[in-house]
Curated annotation (Swiss-Prot):
Residues that bear Phosphoserine: 29
Protein function: t-SNARE involved in diverse vesicle trafficking and membrane fusion processes, including cell plate formation. May function in the secretory pathway.
Signals that turn on the gene: Locally and systemically induced by pathogen infection and locally only by mechanical stresses.
Gene Ontology BP annotations: cytokinesis by cell plate formation; membrane fusion; protein transport; response to mechanical stimulus; response to other organism; vesicle-mediated transport
Compositionally biased residues, Basic and acidic residues: 190-208
Protein name: SNAP25 homologous protein SNAP33
SUPFAM superfamilies (UniProt xref): SNARE fusion complex
Record key words, sorted: Cell cycle, Cell division, Coiled coil, Membrane, Phosphoprotein, Protein transport, Transport
Domain of life according to the entry: Eukaryota
Region (Disordered), start-end ranges: 1-76, 176-228
Tissue: Ubiquitous, with a strong expression in root tips, ovules, very young leaves, vascular tissue, hydathodes, stipules and the abscission and dehiscence zones of the siliques.
Highest classification ranks of the organism: Eukaryota, Viridiplantae, Streptophyta, Embryophyta, Tracheophyta
Alphabetized PROSITE patterns for the sequence: T_SNARE
Similarity section: Belongs to the SNAP-25 family.
Gene that specifies this protein: SNAP33
Length: 300
């Protein structure tokens, strides 16, 4: 009877795991036992800020600004790539939003302005080269003229020598006279209206600001405010394009006039060279005659 009575020690132990876990481990250190008695961070009240939510008071804003700037740059580069690609990777132009189309219009306007400015720069370089070429042509014409003047001086010296050769000989010798097929007239080209004067006149007018559009530098426009919309930015780019095209038209007109001057200068030089060639041939013929006369006199 007494053997069948259940003792409290034999009762089912439902909380044996909890009791075992609550017993201190003899192998645990004092620090670990103290940490077990501290509060669990997950059981803190919501009013207490967690360490993960705390931000650095000195560097938090800088990090956020850096993230925002990098994100803006990535968005800008992505949009610029889409603009260059004409939205081929995103469904085409017809499937874009109004904001994307406005940015696309501004991008195209800026690219057109850059193209116009590039053409203007090329035209200015061509004008500089044309100016130097025109001056070189003028110097070449001056050299031809000086050479022809030297031929005239040779003609005068040769005429005096021919007179001396004609007076030499004996009393009974035949009088010698040189044969002249044509007179030596000298340079025919007049250089009153030289290309250098026209070039210098053009440069002086440009420095004084008297030309209609001196290289596009006379026009200055106020920059747009940061709050300007896409329409205002496009209109600003269109105004820049108009100015650039006007300057380009003026430079092309100057290049046309320079080309005409070059053509007329080359034509004058060709005529001058023809006259110089004829005079040199005449001088060469007369020199040969004088040499023959001298050899005959020495042979006697």
């Amino acid at each position: 009877m007494f053997g069948l009575r259940k003792s409290p020690a034999n009762l089912p132990k439902h909380n044996s795991v909890d009791l075992k876990s609550s017993k201190p481990n003899p192998f645990d250190s004092d620090d670990e036992s103290d940490n077990k008695h501290t509060l669990n961070p997950s059981k803190r009240t919501t009013s207490e800020p967690s360490l993960a939510d705390m931000t650095n008071p000195f560097g938090g804003e800088r990090v956020q600004k850096g993230d925002s700037s990098s994100s803006k740059q990535s968005l800008f580069s992505n949009s610029k790539y889409q603009y260059k690609n004409n939205f081929r990777d995103s469904g085409g132009i017809e499937n874009q939003s109004v904001q994307e189309l406005e940015g696309y219009a501004v991008y195209k306007a800026e690219e057109t302005t850059k193209s116009v400015q590039g053409c203007l720069k090329v035209a200015e370089d061509i004008r500089s080269d044309a100016t130097r070429t025109l001056v070189m042509l003028h110097d070449q014409g001056e050299q031809i003229t000086r050479t022809h003047h030297k031929a005239v001086e040779i003609d005068h010296d040769l005429s005096r020598g021919e007179k001396l050769l004609g007076s030499l000989g004996g009393m009974f010798s035949k009088t010698w006279k040189p044969k002249k097929t044509r007179p030596i007239n000298g340079p025919v080209v007049t250089r009153d209206d030289s290309p250098t004067r026209r070039v210098n006149h053009l440069e002086k007018r440009e420095k004084l600001g008297l030309n209609s559009a001196p290289r596009g530098q006379s026009r200055t426009r106020e920059p747009l405010p940061e709050s300007a919309d896409a329409y205002q930015r496009v209109e600003m780019e269109k105004a820049k394009q108009d100015d650039g095209l006007s300057d380009l038209s003026d430079i092309l007109g100057e290049l046309k006039n320079m080309a005409v001057d070059m053509g007329s200068e080359i034509e004058k030089q060709n005529k001058g060279l023809d006259h110089l060639h004829d005079d040199v041939d005449e001088l060469n013929f007369r020199v040969q005659q004088s040499n023959q006369r001298g050899r005959r006199l020495l042979g006697k």
